[in-house]
Each structure stands twice: as structure tokens, then as C-alpha cells.
């Protein structure tokens, strides 16, 4: 996983 990869960045993105 790259240093800029975040699993939370994908989940919240769908919530928004």
C-alpha cells in the first residue's frame, strides 16, 4: 500500500 493510501478515504467518500 502506498503512503497516501487510506481505507477510510474510500468509505467516507461514498458517505459524502
Swiss-Prot record:
* Gene Ontology biological process: defense response; vasodilation
Tissue spec: Expressed by the skin glands.
What GO molecular function annotations does the UniProt record carry, in alphabetical order?
A: toxin activity
Q: Name one GO cellular component term.
A: extracellular region
What sections of the sequence does the record tag as coiled-coil?
none
Q: What's the family? A: Belongs to the bradykinin-related peptide family.
Its annotated function is as follows: Induces relaxation of arterial smooth muscle, by targeting bradykinin receptors (BDKRB).
Protein name as it appears in the record? Bradykinin RL-16-1
Q: What is the lineage of its organism?
A: Eukaryota, Metazoa, Chordata, Craniata, Vertebrata
Amino acid at each position: 500500500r502506498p503512503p497516501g493510501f487510506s481505507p477510510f478515504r474510500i468509505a467516507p467518500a461514498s458517505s459524502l
